[in-house]
Amino acid sequence: MKYIKKHIQCAVLGMLVLSGCQSYQEDQSRRSKMAQFALNHPVAAQVIGMEDEGLINMTSNATRFAERTGLDDKANGDSRGTQVNAVRQALWQAAIASKFDSIIAEKAGNARLTDMELREGKDDYFSRYLADQAVDQRNNRIGRSIGSAKPDSDMKTLAASILFYYNKVGLWTASEVNNRWHIKQEKLSDGQYAEALKNIAKLDQNGMTEQERNSYKTGTLSEIKRSVKAIRQVED
């Protein structure tokens, strides 16, 4: 009871501070932007959720699908600018745009970015973190386009669409070149594409195996606690 009361007080305070705000400030922290998004779009925020391997929401689902494609996630460390990161971001935004719309998806995406400005034509960066932000922005945009064209699609269908686009057109990744970070749009080979499709074929619409699905237990209070914990761990 004490836990719930504490977070109700925090929510009320947040509403007083952020109510009426529809756009983010340039120097606004990620935590603040995420709280603002949740206040302005509570239904979408609940469906999108926070990443947790034990939860079913768009964010967790996108991570499960991406990690289980079998694509590379080790090239740069911390899943920054990798193939898995590209699929995760594009699928996440596609799912939001498909369920809601591209505007909601863009707001959700920007809430989790430190730098919201997409610098067209800038392919070289001084740090891995900045390069990762740049590829996320581009993959987010691709995902929104795919999701908007497939309204009310389940995430397994969207995952297949993302992989198809990756194979035919390409997604954005980052790599270190001469002590700088370079971003580029690359295609999956036909072999990588076929293998990734095979790997996700055995998953359900939430990216879970049959065993995971059978053992999954939902609980609103438990999910709220885990989401709050995940938000606290967000680095600004």
Model-derived regions: residue spans:
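Glycine-rich short-loop/terminal segments
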Residues: 23-106, 210-236
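Bacterial N-terminal signal peptides that target proteins for export
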Residues: 2-11
